[in-house]
Amino acid sequence: MALVVEDIVKNFGEGLSETKVLKGINFEVEQGEFVILNGASGSGKTTLLTILGGLLSQTSGTVLYNDAPLFDKQHRPSDLRLEDIGFIFQSSHLVPYLKVIEQLTLVGQEAGMTKQQSSTRAIQLLKNIGLEDRLNVYPHQLSGGEKQRVAIMRAFMNNPKIILADEPTASLDADRATKVVEMIRQQIKEQQMIGIMITHDRRLFEYADRVIELEDGKITD
């Protein structure tokens, strides 16, 4: 299986005020591949990632998953569920009144897991990141790095087929950023997901299978 991006164009506005943000983007990401998107601010990275996640529609072009359009005419996933696309953002966005384990179990239950299945899965993921002793604490009791690790495991809770990460390490120091990206890469490889991450940090490029450079809405050679 692969995610195939074919000639994606995105314009904002109309007429004289029209801005061309993406100008014919083409690339492919295979199952189990971890790809980094890089480029200056305004190059179109976040717009592209937002389109891939179904949060924004393209002006023209097609995104294919498993040889079929990723989204139907109503902009709903056509060959997978919404839960099959996982998002990781720069900020953790944890729910302040939920304990750490609840941040994950509620996601699992909303996706159809039983309470027991969800709990088992959440505990295992939290063990993977060394937070098994923090299951019953609240977000305000966690460090910034711990919050981001919980948010990452929350994105992996439903075994998504596609992971989209937008600057998940931007607020972290170099050591924590490295650990976070190692964690993301490990999950993508172990569960054979399609992974795409935006980052400006060139120190993290070595963890990607491939780096795609964007400039002025186009992929550079």
UniProtKB/Swiss-Prot annotation:
CDD domains: ABC_MJ0796_LolCDE_FtsE. It is found in: Cell membrane. The keyword Translocase applies. Keywords: ATP-binding, Cell membrane, Membrane, Nucleotide-binding, Translocase, Transport. It is a peripheral membrane protein. It comes from the Bacteria. One of its GO terms (molecular function) is transmembrane transporter activity. Its main location: membrane. It holds the Pfam family ABC_tran. Residues 3-221 form the ABC transporter domain. Part of the ABC transporter complex hrt involved in hemin import. Responsible for energy coupling to the transport system. Belongs to the ABC transporter superfamily. HrtA family. This is Putative hemin import ATP-binding protein HrtA. It comes from Staphylococcus aureus (strain Newman). The gene is hrtA.
